[in-house]
């Protein structure tokens, strides 16, 4: 019957809408506080060390050209009881390298971390090499980790008598889990009376919204925005000594971030990135291409055979100017980013021409955004 058929269609439509509701993107997406801010003080620490890579197949440093490699090799052998004073060292299987890595936050003794190894001398390739024991120091001069292991190289180099080929960077490699943490950085998180959230992108509105979300969750005013990049959180009494549990809950809170209207321009590559809040006032845009062509066709004048004249070269220059038909487009007040792009694309404008047009619109005071040129 018609009534039964219509009611069935309605039920199916309602069920489809309910099923698709979770997939619908809101007009203003929210993000976790975990993705918007870091816990102040919880960060990685950079480490650096100097070492030697051995086992290279003749692609290491030239010892006569790189004195520090030779000195390091001599010092290492002497520490191991090998006396080479006065001896001539000839090898191409050793290279001096710098070793870098990032010590993770809260890393404990025995934790492994990745390191990057980079050649310092004239080594052609580190392929097949092994890094010897290398202490890794922090900015305070203390040793926090020790690195050693076989290198993984992303490139290669090969050469013959008259030709050579190189792919990638064969003088740079990595050692996965190649360093062991030997010293911990003291950071008593659970004993802190307050914690600060450092926003990755400072903004007054976002900082206020984060503080409001935390206060609503805890039911008390414990969070306060200090500046656009910092929200200070006083630890409630029930979470004293258990700050980790509090931060675990706070990190999952959803907040709608606010961003300033900004246009990023990279003139070298022609890349333009515009935020969603960019607005333009009413403005007319005209764009035309002007082409100037110059051609030289010198004319040679020869004298009579029996005269004493000289050959003369007379310059002849032809200059031509062509201009494409200009187009005029009207960009209305308060248009969105998509409407702005569509309007400018209607003029047949490329990315590099668009850069100049956006800067001109900004100079005219018709664009409500900051333009940052990289």
From Swiss-Prot:
The gene is flgI. HAMAP family: FlgI. Coiled coil: none annotated. It is found in: Periplasm; Bacterial flagellum basal body. InterPro entries: Flag_FlgI (IPR001782). Residues 1-29 form the signal peptide. Belongs to the FlgI family. GO terms for cellular component: bacterial-type flagellum basal body, distal rod, P ring; outer membrane-bounded periplasmic space. Assembles around the rod to form the L-ring and probably protects the motor/basal body from shearing forces during rotation. The basal body constitutes a major portion of the flagellar organelle and consists of four rings (L,P,S, and M) mounted on a central rod. Disulfide bonds: none annotated. Keywords: Bacterial flagellum, Periplasm, Signal. This is Flagellar P-ring protein. One of its GO terms (biological process) is bacterial-type flagellum-dependent cell motility. GO terms for molecular function: structural molecule activity. It comes from Nitrobacter hamburgensis (strain DSM 10229 / NCIMB 13809 / X14).
